[in-house]
């Protein structure tokens, strides 16, 4: 992970080191017009999944370079390293439930006691590995399910 500094990678690294922060996504708008997401010109929009509001604001106050506009619906007052109080904006990302229904035809090697739970666990692991704003590709689950002993065919 990057060294905590004013770069995008550094800010992300610093935020990821905070307790409770599970993911961070940063959208930069380096242009003179609002971007396709509605972020103001020359702004940085930080999204955090988890973490405490005050911790995130303090971290951003310390790590974001002077003169940078922070976008976001959360507005928190935080002191920077010099003790100056700054208005810090960011947003929390929202967990979105993902549901999967998979039909499996089994073979004689299928473990009737634990097989279904193992499949559920593998699907949950894939979903939990997704990054914020990532796309869910159902077909990426198939190789994992087919690798389970006793699975003959998979469909949805």
Language-model features: where?
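Carbohydrate-recognition loop of C-type lectin domains
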Residues: 2-134
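Short loop/turn elements at secondary-structure junctions
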Residues: 20-21, 134-156
């Amino acid at each position: 992970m990057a060294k905590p500094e004013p770069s995008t990678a550094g800010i992300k690294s610093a935020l990821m080191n905070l307790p409770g922060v599970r993911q961070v996504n940063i959208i930069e708008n380096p242009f003179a017009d609002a971007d396709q997401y509605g972020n103001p010109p020359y702004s940085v929009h930080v999204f955090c999944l988890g973490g405490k509001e005050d911790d995130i604001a303090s971290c951003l106050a310390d790590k974001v370079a002077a003169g940078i506009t922070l976008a976001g619906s959360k507005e928190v007052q935080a002191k920077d390293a010099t003790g100056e109080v700054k208005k810090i904006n960011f947003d929390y990302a929202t967990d979105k439930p993902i549901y999967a229904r998979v039909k499996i035809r089994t073979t004689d090697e299928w473990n009737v006691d634990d097989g279904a739970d193992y499949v559920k666990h593998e699907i949950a692991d894939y979903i939990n590995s997704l990054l914020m704003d990532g796309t869910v590709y159902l077909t990426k689950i198939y190789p994992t399910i087919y690798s389970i002993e006793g699975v003959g065919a998979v469909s949805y």
